[in-house]
Amino acid sequence: MKPVSDGIPRTTSLKGQRGAVAVEMAIVLPLFAILLLGAFEFGDIARTHQVLQNAAREGARFSANKTNWIAGSTDPTVQAATLARIKDRVVAYLQGEKITVNASDVIVDQNYPIAIPGLPGVKGSHITVNYQRSLIFPGITGLIPSAAINLQGNAVFRNFY
């Protein structure tokens, strides 16, 4: 018994397919590379932001314990030295994570109001860390309007004294 043909010619030649695969690869490979590099970039940005948050939290915790050194002292040199120690603590934490910031990028506010119902006048230590991060893969800057991203870490701890 002979099979019935459906009228569509069948060829087993792959000569025409080789060129199509090369064209598809030329289109898909750059898009895949951009997607992969973007994922690495985004992951590192997220890590850097988390490290900034942790550094701000460490500074706020340290500052909350040192509030009475500043508020209880009338000597401006003691107040300035205590603020410098708080900022140095944050900078040292970031240096341990291979992030370089200046002490001027750390903002300390030890009179930050915290709203707690039934407890008026509660103050906290608010630490802000500003950091400008450049991109890992500079070739992506054509896709992103700015070659640097501004990141910020914030933390508030209630003052203990």
Locate the predicted segments by residue.
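Short, flexible active-site loop motifs that bind/organize anionic cofactors or intermediates
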Residues: P9, F42, P76
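N-terminal leader/signal peptides at the extreme start of proteins
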Residues: M1-R18
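Hydrophobic residues within membrane-embedded alpha helices
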Residues: S13-G16, E24, Q53, I149
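Short, conserved structural patches
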Residues: K2-D6, H49, N54, E58-Y161
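Aliphatic-rich helix starts adjacent to a transmembrane/signal segment
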Residues: A20-V21, I27, L36-T67
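Hydrophobic transmembrane alpha-helices
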Residues: L35-L36, P76
